[in-house]
Swiss-Prot record:
Keywords, sorted A to Z: Ribonucleoprotein, Ribosomal protein
Similarity comment: family membership: Belongs to the bacterial ribosomal protein bL27 family.
GO cellular component term, pick one: cytosolic large ribosomal subunit
Protein name: Large ribosomal subunit protein bL27
Domain of life: Bacteria
One GO term (biological process): translation
Biological source species: Campylobacter hominis (strain ATCC BAA-381 / DSM 21671 / CCUG 45161 / LMG 19568 / NCTC 13146 / CH001A)
Example GO molecular function: structural constituent of ribosome
InterPro entries, alphabetized: Ribosomal_bL27, Ribosomal_bL27_CS
Gene responsible for this protein: rpmA
């Protein structure tokens, strides 16, 4: 008889749940003020015109308009919202 209980094979078989990060509204989509455009960790995408940035780096629309993804540097990208004209 074993004097210790056998270790199960599931001891290391855990995984954390997904954080639901990523782009929520894509380029060309219409957004209303307050709509979340991107959820991200850090500023992988920077805030451009008519968008705000939350304390958790979430980018959201400040006005009603159309989402546009742009480059403002060789390596950096930003997202802006432009009103329908």
């Amino acid at each position: 008889m074993a004097h210790k209980k056998g270790q199960g094979s599931t001891q290391n078989n855990r995984d954390s749940i997904g954080r639901r990060l990523g782009v929520k509204k894509f380029g060309g989509e219409f957004v209303r003020a307050g709509n979340i455009i991107i959820r991200q960790r850090g500023t992988a995408t920077h805030a451009g015109n008519n968008v705000g940035i939350g304390t958790d780096h979430t980018i959201f629309a400040l006005i009603d308009g159309v989402v546009k993804f742009e480059r403002f540097d060789k390596t950096r990208k930003q997202v802006s919202v432009y009103p329908l004209s």
